């Protein structure tokens, strides 16, 4: 439960900071503080932090600090694009190398045939590249308020739909000893 809260906490802080704290600068500051607190608490509670969380927090810190110092919101807006591209590359290359990263992320939840992990890896890479393109379109063509609303209310449903679309692959190819 705490892991889920640590993932959505910074997004909620960003949304609240934007709409109740005075705009993108406040939102960025709130998100930075919340992210550092969450990753620290994850480490204290679980004694570990996932690589993806470390990458995400590092990119956030760099883009967020540059946004705060420069006053230019472009840097915080390109953060999702940078992360999506990094994650897309990770999933794509791990699929190409036949050592799918997604397997290590999800194997404790579901066990699949090896070729299904590779297929899921390619699909996940495609999803992240798609999300990078969508983020670029939204932040470059719409006002800050629209981008923030998309970040909070658009990304989650799109991700949920992507996950639902993977269910047939997962259910068809799960191994008998899978927990799901």
Swiss-Prot record:
Origin: domain of life: Bacteria
Keyword Transmembrane helix: yes
Keywords: Cell inner membrane, Cell membrane, Membrane, Transmembrane, Transmembrane helix
Cellular localisation: Cell inner membrane
Principal location listed in the UniProt entry: membrane
PANTHER family: INNER MEMBRANE-SPANNING PROTEIN YCIB, INTRACELLULAR SEPTATION PROTEIN A-RELATED
Family of this protein: Belongs to the YciB family.
Protein purpose: Plays a role in cell envelope biogenesis, maintenance of cell envelope integrity and membrane homeostasis.
Name recorded for this polypeptide: Inner membrane-spanning protein YciB
Organism: Rickettsia bellii (strain RML369-C)
């Amino acid at each position: 439960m705490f892991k889920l809260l640590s993932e959505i906490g910074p997004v909620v802080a960003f949304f609240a900071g934007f709409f109740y704290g005075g705009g993108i600068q406040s939102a960025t500051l709130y998100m930075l503080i919340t992210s550092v607190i969450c990753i620290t608490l994850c480490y204290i509670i679980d004694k570990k932090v996932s690589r993806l969380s470390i990458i995400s927090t590092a990119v956030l810190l760099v883009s967020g600090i540059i946004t705060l110092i420069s006053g230019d919101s472009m840097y915080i807006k390109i953060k999702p694009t940078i992360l999506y591209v990094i994650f897309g590359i990770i999933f794509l290359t791990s699929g190409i190398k036949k050592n799918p990263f997604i397997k290590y992320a999800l194997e404790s939840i579901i066990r699949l045939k090896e070729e299904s992990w590779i297929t899921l890896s390619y699909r996940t890479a495609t999803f992240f590249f798609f999300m990078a393109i969508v983020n670029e379109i939204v932040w470059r063509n719409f006002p800050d308020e629209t981008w923030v609303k998309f970040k909070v209310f658009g990304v989650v449903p799109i991700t949920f739909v992507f996950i639902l679309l993977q269910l047939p692959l997962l259910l068809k190819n799960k191994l008998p000893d899978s927990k799901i």
